[in-house]
Every structure is written in C-alpha cells, then in structure tokens.
Swiss-Prot record:
The lineage of its organism: Eukaryota, Metazoa, Ecdysozoa, Nematoda, Chromadorea. It comes from Caenorhabditis elegans. Belongs to the membrane-bound acyltransferase family. Porcupine subfamily. One of its GO terms (molecular function) is Wnt-protein binding. The gene is mom-1. It is a multi-pass membrane protein. This is Protein-serine O-palmitoleoyltransferase porcupine. Its EC number is 2.3.1.250.
C-alpha cells in the first residue's frame, strides 16, 4: 500500500464555495497532468524514430533530468540528488553488489536526505521529492537484481544503455508507475497497431484522466460535497480523501501507460473499495508497487516464517517512504490485519469446506474451479464473504482516517495515528487478535 506522491498542493485549495474549490482543483490537476501528457506524446513519437542507441540514452538522461527540475522545488538541487542515486547504484551494480545491498544503501541515502532536510527545517521539500525518489529506488533495485542474476563480468554498452533507458524514462519519473524491466521493454518495442487501436487507447486514456480529475476534486473538496453528521462520518470522509488522492495518481499513470501501448494495470478503485479481503485491498492498492515488493522481497523468503516475511515486506515498503512513523505504523497495521484475516479465513475454509478464503478459488476455462462443498454461490458462503467485504471497507476507514490535513505538508507527529485509532478503541487490531485466537481454536 502506498501513496508516496505529494498531493499537498491541491489540499490547500479546499476553502471557499464548492464551485470555486472544484474549479481550482480541476485547473491545478489538469495543469500537472497536461505537462506529463506532453512528455508521453513526445516519447511515444521518439520510440518510433530509428535513432542510435547512444543518442537515445542521452535523450533519456537529459529529458529525465529536465523533468525532475521542472516538477520539483530547488530545481538544480533535485536534479543533482536524483542523479546521485543513479550514479552510486549503477556503480555498485556493475561491481556485482547484491540487489539487497543496493536497496539498503538507497534507503539509507533517502533517510540521510530526510534528516538533512529536517535539520534545515525543509521537511516540505523532502515530502515533495520523496515520491520521485521512491520510484527511482525501485527501478535501480530492479536493475541491480537483474545484473546480479546475469552474473556476467563482461558489461557491454548495449546492455548498459538498456538499463539507463529503463531508469531514465521521463513520462514515468514523477507519478510512476513502476514497471518491471520486461514490462518496460515490451512497452517500448511495441509496434504501431493501426489507427483504430491507437484511437481506442487514446479514448481510454482520456476517460482515465477525466475520472482521475473527478476523484481529485472529490478528494480536495469533500467537505464542500458532504457535511459530516458524526465523528465517524468525518473519519470516513478523511479516509476517503486519502484514497481518492491516491486514485488520482493511479488513474493518471494508467492513462500514460495506455497511451504508450502497455496493458499493465496500475489500480482499479472498485477492486479496492469493494474488496473481498484486506489481502486483496493491499495487493490492488498499487499493483506495480505490490509486484515489486512481492517479487523482490517477499518471494525471496529471508525468513522461514511466513509472518516474518510479511512484516519484513511491509517494513521495506514503509522505509521506501523514509522514516515516516505515520506511514510505517499504518503499513505494519495493514500487514497485521491482512495476515490475521488470511490465516483465519484459510482455517475457516478448510474446517467447514466453504469458499471463504481471502483469495477466491481460481477460474479456469471460464468456469470456477472450486472443490469446496459450499461454493461462492451458496448462502452461508455468500453471507460470510459479504461480512468480510464490509469489514474490509471498515479497515479502509480505520487505516486511512489518520491522514488528516493538519500535518500533511510537514509530516505527522509520533503519536498522531495512535490518538485517532484510540477514538475507535483500536477496533481493527482487536478484531485481528480475535481472528488469530479463533484460528487456533477452530
């Protein structure tokens, strides 16, 4: 789960009437997206031009550096920091250092930068560049693991240039998304598919952008749309605002991916809002980010215990945001909630032969491959799955209601999340402990 990109610039526009707020947010978001669309169109055109590898590499590096300067504060400083991460990581990767060492080194650099900014009271600058660096670190780590897997002492320019192209791809520098090395080159090498198909991609992209801007307006102007009648409603609206700002980023990047001819799915808001389980919520929140963590952290199984591997994966996810207690405690809470629910539902499914596990039985050959006595369509399974769907919706409120506007521009204090969760009697944690206890009894 991740919302690493700054959204503070739009949250400042909430005051005033609904019409004024909506207009200001729509203009601000469209201005940001239109710049990125220009980059997408430019590089869609460039990829069809037969230029040499050397020229292509220089174009990518120059344009990416310019993009970082264009979208961030302290333009030159941001470009230097961005390229410093690249130079150090690539130098270590070429020397066959482990991907884990490079990931740990980049996280250490990120935390050092955060402390430096904090010392000079520039926390807002760090928050503005954090999302860019997080995606950058993920790509650098992917390159490091690829080089480690290749295990070759002979490093040719053609191979090096392919990694540089992957790391320095301007349309994905600001909002992402993260693509694996294979996904990126599948997208880059895709041929022109004809006017009708390309027009279809453009229409889908424009629809995604329209939905993204609509959700951005609701996220920033939610108290103009809805008047909370209780504290719970206010908490639910705060959590909704956090989610919808995340959907704005995801749908925008989905539009860019579609324009460039890739079929990678970034996120489907409906699969998050109405998820079968908290496990599905986590995996659907940002699918490329989840893929990175699953492939490079969880599947490598540094520990014998599944629980330890789950919490280690969520810990790495939180550290990619820097030392952010609010994000760390939220991600670890989600990990604990998802783990306890998954264990309980797995036990419940096996004990009573019901299709109620956190993941639905797979569909093969257009038919449900379910060997349970009580399938998804039976009454008791439907009721139990509906209960967990509603519980997942509550967990979204519980974990998202801590992201209030009070400290969003400078970072949240240590006890902020605990105080807000205390107003709900730590209910999601209590439910999770109950699930763990019941899974031992059943």
């Amino acid at each position: 789960m991740d919302n690493g990109h700054g959204y503070e610039e739009f949250e400042l526009l909430e005051d005033g009437s609904l019409g004024e707020c909506s207009t200001q947010v729509a203009n601000a978001t469209f201005l940001t997206i239109s710049k990125l669309i220009c980059l997408v169109v430019a590089f869609k055109f460039i990829k069809h031009i037969p230029i040499s590898t050397t020229v292509r590499v220089y174009v990518h590096v120059f344009a990416s550096t310019f993009t970082v300067m264009w979208f961030s504060r302290n333009h030159l400083q941001s470009a230097i920091i961005y390229n410093m991460f690249s130079l150090i990581s690539l130098a270590l990767a070429i020397k066959q250092f482990s991907g884990y060492i490079i990931l740990a080194g980049n996280i250490s650099l990120l935390i050092a930068l955060q402390n430096f900014c904090r010392h000079y009271r520039s926390e807002d600058y760090f928050l503005s560049i954090r999302g860019i660096l997080m995606i950058h670190i993920m790509r650098l780590t992917t390159v490091a693991f690829n080089l480690e897997k290749a295990n070759s002492n002979k490093f040719r320019f053609v191979q090096f240039s392919s990694y540089v192209e992957y790391i320095y791809f301007p349309p994905f520098i600001i909002f992402g998304p993260y693509l694996s090395f294979e996904q990126f080159f599948k997208m880059r090498d895709k041929k022109w598919t004809g006017s009708e198909n390309e027009l279809g991609f453009i229409i889908q992209s424009l629809l995604a952008i329209f939905n993204a801007i609509t959700l951005a307006i609701i996220s920033s102007c939610h108290f103009e749309f809805f008047e909370p009648s209780s504290q719970f409603m206010e908490d639910a609206l705060t959590a909704m605002s956090f989610r919808f700002s995340h959907y704005f980023v995801c749908l925008s990047t989905q539009a860019f991916v579609l324009m460039l001819g890739s079929d990678v799915v970034v996120a489907n808001p409906l699969n998050i809002e109405f998820s079968r389980s908290t496990l599905q919520t986590v995996s659907e929140w940002n699918k490329p980010f989840h893929t990175f963590l699953h492939e490079n952290i969880f599947k490598r199984r540094l520990f014998n215990s599944t629980a330890c591997n789950v919490f280690f994966t969520f810990a790495v996810s939180s550290l990619l945001h820097g030392l952010d207690f609010q994000m760390t405690i939220t991600l670890l809470a989600l990990g604990f909630i998802a783990y306890s629910e998954t264990v309980f539902r797995k036990r419940l499914s096996a004990r009573y032969s019901m299709c109620v596990a956190a993941k639905a039985c797979p569909v093969r050959s257009n038919s449900l491959s379910c060997k349970h006595r009580h399938s998804n369509k039976t009454g008791r399974a439907l009721i139990i799955n509906l209960f967990f769907l509603m519980l997942s919706m509550y967990h979204l409120v519980f974990t998202g209601m801590t992201f209030t506007d009070d400290y969003s521009a400078i970072g949240y204090p240590f006890d902020h999340a605990w105080k807000i969760w205390g107003s709900h009697y730590y209910s999601s944690f209590m439910i999770s402990f109950l699930f763990l206890a019941l899974s031992k009894i059943i």
